[in-house]
C-alpha cells in the first residue's frame, strides 16, 4: 500500500515540476487532497518571497482539483479557499502579477493535454483509412473501365495466357485429327501393298529410333506405317521367333500388331477432355506391350525408356474420363517382378532402337505351344491383386498357335487375344492378329466413402463425384471472386468430372492386318474380342471383376480354324 502511494506521489511530482519540495504523509482519503493541504502550508511560508509563482501554483492546483477529483465537496472546498487566497495575493501584489501571461501558459498546457488525450488514439488509424479508401477507389475505377468479363477473369495477362492455352489445345486436337486420317489412309494402302509383295525379314522402328530394315518395299511401307502410328495410336511391337528342330534353318520375323482404332479411337477422342487435363493426351502413353515367353516363363516389356515412368504413377492419364485411361492400362507390365535390368541393358547394348525379347531360338514350335498355359500374377502398389489365366486350344500337328490373354485389375479390365497361324514348320510366322478390348467399370459411391486410400485415380474420381453434391461449392462456383482463385490454383490438379451412363460396359474391336511373308502362303486372320467387366461392392467388403475374351483365327489357304477363349476372374478384398 505504502509503495503504491509512494509511486503515485513521484508521478505527481514529475508532472508538476517544482510545485512543492516536501510533501507530508498523505491522508487516507486522497493523495491530491494531502498534497493540496501540504502545499497550503508551503504557500503560506513562501507568499512574501514570490507571490507571482504562488499565484501560478494556486491556479494549477485549482485545475488539478477540477480535472482529477470527482468528489463535489472537495471541489467546493478547494474553490472557496483558492478564491480567498487569490484575492489576497492580487491585493497584496497587484503590480507584480500580470494576469494574461499565466493564462496563456495555462491555455497552452490545456490545449497540449487535450491534443494528447483526444488526438493520440484517433490520429493513427485515420491516415490508414484514407489509404484504404484510395486503394479501393482505384480498384473501382479500374473495374469501371474494364468490362464485366474482364473483371471476372482478372488482369489482361491472365486473359492472354488463357487464350494461348486454348490456341495450343485447338492445334493439338487438329493435329490428332490429321494423324487419324493419315493413319486410316496409310493402313488401307499398306494392306493392299503387302498382299501383293513379298517380305522375308523386317525390323521396325519405334518413334525416332532406327534399326536395320531388310526386305522389299512392302516392309518399308509397313515400317513407315508403324513410325507414324506408334507415337499417337496404340500400336504394339512383338517379336516372335519360331525355329524348327534343325539348328541350321531359322525363321525369323517381326510382326506388327495394329489395333483397328476406327471404332474405339472415335470414342476415345470424343471422351477426351482437352480443356482440363494438362498432361499429354492418352494416346501418347501407349508404347507398352507384354509378350509372354513360354519357354523361359519370363515377361519382357517392349517399350521405350521414356515411357517407363508413365507406368509408375497410378493416375497416368486418368482425368476422370473413363475412356481416357485405357491406354495406360499397360501399367502392371512394369512391376518389379516383370521388368528386369537385363531389358534395359539389352536395349542399350543392341543397335540404337531394336527391341529384343528373351526367346529361346533352339526350341521347336511344339515345345513352345505346349507351355502356353501359364497363370500370371501382378501386385499393385495399393495392395490390389489381379490374377489372369489364359487357356489356349491349339492343334499340334497343323502348327497352329493361338494365345489369349486377359488381365483384370483394380477397377479396369484389360483383355487381349492374339492368334498365330503357321503355314508349316519351316516357314516362319505368316499372320498375326491381335485384338484388345478394354472396359472401365464404375464402382458404387459408398465404397469411395469408406475406402480412402484406394488409389490416386480413385481419389480423383472421388473428388469429381462429390464436388457437385455440396451446395457450398456450387455457390462458390457461381460467385466470381472465388471462381478466379480456384481456377488458378486447382485446375491442373483436379479434373472436370465425367459421368459414365452405365456401370458395366462391353466393348468390341476387331483388327485385320495381314500380308504375305512368303510367295506361296496367303493368309487372312480375323480376331474378335468381347470383354466384359463387372464390379460389385457389398458394403465395401470385396469387389469382383470378370473379363472374358474370345479370339478366332482363320487361315484361308489351308481352311483351318483355331479358336481361343480366355476367362479371367479377379477378386479384390478391401
UniProtKB/Swiss-Prot annotation:
Splicing factor specifically required for neural cell differentiation. Acts in conjunction with nPTB/PTBP2 by binding directly to its regulated target transcripts and promotes neural-specific exon inclusion in many genes that function in neural cell differentiation. Required to promote the inclusion of neural-specific exon 10 in nPTB/PTBP2, leading to increased expression of neural-specific nPTB/PTBP2. GO terms for molecular function: mRNA binding. Its main location: nucleus. Residues 51-72, 194-217, 366-385, 478-487 have a biased composition (Basic and acidic residues). Belongs to the nSR100 family. Residues 73-88, 102-120, 128-184, 454-477, 526-539, 560-574 have a biased composition (Basic residues). Residues 405-422, 496-508, 540-559 have a biased composition (Low complexity). Residues 45-217, 257-291, 366-422, 454-508, 526-574 are annotated as: Disordered. InterPro entries: SRRM_C, SRRM_Domain-Containing. GO terms for biological process: cell differentiation; mRNA processing; nervous system development; regulation of alternative mRNA splicing, via spliceosome; regulation of RNA splicing; RNA splicing. It is found in: Nucleus. This is Serine/arginine repetitive matrix protein 4. Keywords: Differentiation, mRNA processing, mRNA splicing, Nucleus, RNA-binding. It comes from Danio rerio (Zebrafish). GO terms for cellular component: nucleus. PANTHER family: SERINE/ARGININE REPETITIVE MATRIX PROTEIN 3-RELATED (PTHR34755), SERINE_ARGININE REPETITIVE MATRIX PROTEIN 4 (PTHR34755:SF1). Residues 275-289 have a biased composition (Polar residues).
Amino acid at each position: 500500500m505504502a509503495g503504491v502511494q509512494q509511486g503515485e506521489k513521484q508521478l505527481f511530482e514529475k508532472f508538476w515540476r517544482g510545485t512543492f519540495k516536501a510533501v507530508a504523509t498523505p491522508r487516507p482519503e486522497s493523495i491530491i487532497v494531502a498534497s493540496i493541504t501540504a502545499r497550503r502550508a508551503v504557500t503560506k511560508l513562501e507568499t512574501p518571497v514570490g507571490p507571482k509563482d504562488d499565484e501560478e501554483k494556486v491556479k494549477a492546483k485549482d485545475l488539478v482539483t477540477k480535472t482529477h477529483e470527482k468528489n463535489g465537496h472537495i471541489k467546493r472546498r478547494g474553490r472557496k479557499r483558492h478564491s480567498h487566497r487569490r484575492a489576497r495575493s492580487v491585493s497584496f501584489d497587484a503590480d507584480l502579477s500580470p494576469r494574461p501571461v499565466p493564462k496563456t501558459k495555462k491555455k497552452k498546457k490545456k490545449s497540449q493535454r487535450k491534443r494528447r488525450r483526444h488526438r493520440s488514439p484517433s490520429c493513427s488509424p485515420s491516415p490508414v483509412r484514407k489509404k484504404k479508401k484510395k486503394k479501393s477507389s482505384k480498384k473501382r475505377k479500374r473495374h469501371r473501365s474494364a468490362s464485366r468479363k474482364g473483371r471476372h477473369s482478372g488482369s489482361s495477362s491472365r486473359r492472354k495466357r488463357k487464350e494461348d492455352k486454348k490456341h495450343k489445345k485447338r492445334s493439338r486436337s487438329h493435329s490428332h485429327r490429321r494423324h487419324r486420317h493419315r493413319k486410316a489412309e496409310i493402313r488401307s494402302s499398306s494392306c493392299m501393298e503387302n498382299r501383293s509383295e513379298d517380305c522375308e525379314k523386317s525390323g521396325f522402328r519405334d518413334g525416332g529410333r532406327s534399326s536395320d530394315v531388310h526386305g522389299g518395299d512392302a516392309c518399308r511401307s509397313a515400317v513407315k506405317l508403324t513410325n507414324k502410328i506408334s507415337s499417337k495410336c496404340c500400336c504394339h511391337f512383338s517379336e516372335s521367333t519360331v525355329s524348327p528342330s534343325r539348328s541350321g534353318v531359322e525363321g525369323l520375323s517381326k510382326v506388327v500388331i495394329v489395333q483397328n482404332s476406327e471404332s474405339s479411337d472415335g470414342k476415345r477422342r470424343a471422351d477426351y477432355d482437352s480443356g482440363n487435363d494438362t498432361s499429354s493426351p492418352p494416346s501418347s502413353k501407349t508404347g507398352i506391350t507384354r509378350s509372354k515367353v513360354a519357354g523361359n516363363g519370363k515377361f519382357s516389356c517392349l517399350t521405350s525408356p521414356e515411357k517407363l515412368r508413365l507406368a509408375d504413377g497410378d493416375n497416368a492419364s486418368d482425368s476422370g474420363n473413363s475412356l481416357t485411361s485405357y491406354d495406360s492400362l499397360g501399367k502392371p507390365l512394369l512391376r518389379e517382378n516383370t521388368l528386369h535390368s537385363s531389358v534395359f541393358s539389352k536395349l542399350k547394348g543392341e543397335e540404337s532402337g531394336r527391341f529384343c525379347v528373351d526367346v529361346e531360338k533352339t526350341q521347336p514350335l511344339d515345345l513352345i505351344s505346349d507351355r502356353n498355359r501359364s497363370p500370371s500374377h501382378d501386385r499393385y502398389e495399393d495392395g490390389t491383386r489381379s490374377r489372369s489365366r489364359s487357356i489356349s486350344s491349339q492343334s499340334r500337328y497343323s502348327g497352329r498357335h493361338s494365345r489369349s490373354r486377359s488381365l483384370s485389375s483394380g477397377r479396369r479390365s484389360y483383355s487381349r487375344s492374339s492368334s498365330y497361324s503357321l503355314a508349316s514348320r519351316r516357314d516362319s510366322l505368316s499372320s498375326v492378329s491381335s485384338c484388345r478390348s478394354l472396359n472401365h467399370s464404375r464402382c458404387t459411391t459408398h465404397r469411395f466413402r469408406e475406402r480412402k486410400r484406394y488409389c490416386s485415380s480413385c481419389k480423383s474420381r472421388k473428388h469429381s463425384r462429390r464436388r457437385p453434391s455440396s451446395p457450398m461449392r456450387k455457390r462458390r462456383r457461381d460467385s466470381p471472386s472465388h471462381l478466379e482463385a480456384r481456377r488458378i490454383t486447382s485446375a491442373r490438379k483436379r479434373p472436370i468430372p465425367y459421368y459414365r451412363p452405365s456401370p458395366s460396359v462391353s466393348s468390341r474391336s476387331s483388327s485385320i492386318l495381314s500380308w504375305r511373308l512368303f510367295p506361296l502362303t496367303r493368309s487372312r486372320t480375323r480376331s474378335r474380342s468381347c470383354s466384359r467387366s463387372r464390379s460389385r461392392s457389398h458394403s465395401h467388403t470385396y469387389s469382383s471383376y470378370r473379363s472374358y475374351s474370345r479370339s478366332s483365327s482363320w487361315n484361308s489357304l489351308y481352311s483351318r480354324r483355331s479358336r481361343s477363349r480366355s476367362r479371367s476372374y479377379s477378386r479384390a478384398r478391401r
